[in-house]
Structures are given as C-alpha cells and as structure tokens.
C-alpha cells in the first residue's frame, strides 16, 4: 500500500516536516502540450497575435507561477527558486512547453515545474482564445494535455 506523507497517524492532513532533511541541489523539468488550429499556430510563429508576443508572455507567466506554487498548492513548501527556464517547441499541430526549475533545499521542486508549464500553456490559450473558438463559441481543436515531469534530479548532501 502506498505511503501518503501528507497524512499523519490519525489520518489527518498536515504539512510534512522537512526541517531535519539536508539541503541539496534539486532540479525538475516538466512538459505539456497545447493543440491549436494551424492558422493560430502560424499567427504565433509569425508574430501576428493582436494581444502581443504569445510565447514571451507565456514565459513570464510560467516564471511567476513557479514562484507562487507554495501559495497555490496547500501542502507545498515554499522553496528558494534558484532558476527557471521555460522554452517552447512548435509543430504544425501543437506547441510543447517545457519548464526547468532549480533550487537548493530540503524537498523536491517538481510541483513548481508542473505549475510553471501549466500556467505557460494556460496563458497561450488565453492569448489566442478568440481565434480558437468556433461559431458556437466552443473550442473544437484547442486542448492541453500531456503535462508530466520528464526529469527530476536530486544532488547528494555535502
């Protein structure tokens, strides 16, 4: 049976005490995709979106989200964010977002990477939603999926 560290011996939710753990370098990378209409993808690539530079805005939004993860996820520890790198790869069907986060601390930083990639993708959607809607106001093509942690690195204590 799996162990859920956020439940105490009375099966009550609590924030895990990480104070006895040593500080070590940590890194996590997450990715996810947003599927868009070909015309929208072309407009993004050619800088023709009226709201501005979609990918630059998504990078900023993702970075801000990384720094606020502790305030959004109840049992997530506030961590000193040492660095955030967000980048995108575009195909003729989707944009794939990547978010790498680094820290030096007592617990992993994968929730921050997942939050960063998620908000980057949501920001892309928000900036192009007017072009993605059909006549009925629905989004027949637009979807976000495949959000996952693709790498997690934990250093060793000194």
Curated annotation (Swiss-Prot):
Active site: 126
UniProt-listed InterPro entries: Mo_CF_biosynth-C_arc, MoaC, MoaC_sf, Mopterin_CF_biosynth-C_dom
Binding positions (substrate): 75-77, 111-112
Lyase in keyword set: yes
Enzyme Commission code(s) on record: 4.6.1.17
Keywords on record: Lyase, Molybdenum cofactor biosynthesis
Gene Ontology terms describing biological process: Mo-molybdopterin cofactor biosynthetic process
Enzyme class: lyase
Disulphides: none
Molecular function GO terms recorded: cyclic pyranopterin monophosphate synthase activity
Metabolic or biological pathway, per its Swiss-Prot or TrEMBL entry: Cofactor biosynthesis; molybdopterin biosynthesis
Keyword check for Lyase: yes
Reaction catalyzed: (8S)-3',8-cyclo-7,8-dihydroguanosine 5'-triphosphate = cyclic pyranopterin phosphate + diphosphate
Family assignment from sequence similarity: Belongs to the MoaC family.
Its biological purpose: Catalyzes the conversion of (8S)-3',8-cyclo-7,8-dihydroguanosine 5'-triphosphate to cyclic pyranopterin monophosphate (cPMP).
Subunit structure: Homohexamer; trimer of dimers.
Name this polypeptide is given: Probable cyclic pyranopterin monophosphate synthase
Organism: Methanocorpusculum labreanum (strain ATCC 43576 / DSM 4855 / Z)
Taxonomic path: Archaea, Methanobacteriati, Methanobacteriota, Stenosarchaea group, Methanomicrobia
């Amino acid at each position: 049976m799996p162990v859920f560290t956020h439940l105490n011996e009375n099966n009550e939710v609590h924030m895990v005490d990480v104070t006895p753990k040593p500080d070590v370098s940590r890194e996590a990378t997450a990715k996810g995709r947003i599927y868009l209409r070909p015309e929208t993808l072309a407009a993004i690539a050619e800088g023709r979106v009226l709201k501005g530079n979609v990918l630059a805005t998504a990078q900023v939004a993702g970075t801000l989200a990384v720094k606020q993860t502790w305030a959004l996820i109840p049992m997530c520890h506030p961590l000193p964010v040492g660095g955030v790198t967000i980048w995108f790869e575009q195909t003729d069907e989707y944009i794939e977002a990547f978010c790498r986060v680094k820290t030096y601390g007592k617990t992993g930083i994968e929730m921050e990477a997942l939050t960063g990639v998620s908000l980057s993708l949501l920001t892309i959607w928000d900036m192009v939603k007017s072009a993605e809607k059909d006549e009925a106001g629905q989004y027949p093509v637009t979807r976000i999926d495949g959000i996952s942690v693709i790498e997690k690195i934990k250093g060793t204590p000194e």
